[in-house]
Amino acid sequence: MNHAHLGKVSDHSGIDIGIVSPDGRQGMIEHAQQFAEAGIPFVFDPGQGMPMFDGDDLMRFVDQATWLAFNDYEARLMEERTGLSMGRLAERVEAVVVTRGGEGSTIYTGTHQLEIPTAPVSDLRDPTGCGDAYRGGLLYGLGHGMDWEMIGRIASLMGAIKIETQGPQNHHFTRDEFEQRFKDSFGIRL
């Protein structure tokens, strides 16, 4: 993590979307700036890295990012450090996503607030990695130009699939399995 800043966005071609997630402080700062300078839309997801930044630092990330993503604890900390509510932050970016574990998630877009339900879970095995799985669904939906209702539900289902599997990244499925479970969970086709 302390060497993440050595990797440069410009070292890679064909990047359509990015994410700045918990890493070394300098790496997070530099990657956000590099994405912004390259005109590459990105999610700022500070996660457990948030304590490294004060309100001014966080506002610089907001000004560079296209989207923001937090869990409920991080959202409260973001509001405390910046003095802005999630709704006010959503006026500065395309959307703010706040996950709330088994309570679902909320997506703030400008003046709209979407409540995204959780997907049904058959077996609660291990929550480790659920946030990452959710972010994977978020990036998939954004990368495919989907609307927020679909993006949120894809991300929700990713978290549900993950929590049913022991280990942070041991879950797997086929596209057909995912599409069927999506239909069963939300009553709509993917």
How should each PLM-predicted stretch be described?
Residues 1-114, 177, 183-190:
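Ribokinase/PfkB-type carbohydrate-kinase core domain
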Residues 83-190:
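Conserved phosphate-binding/catalytic region of the ribokinase-like
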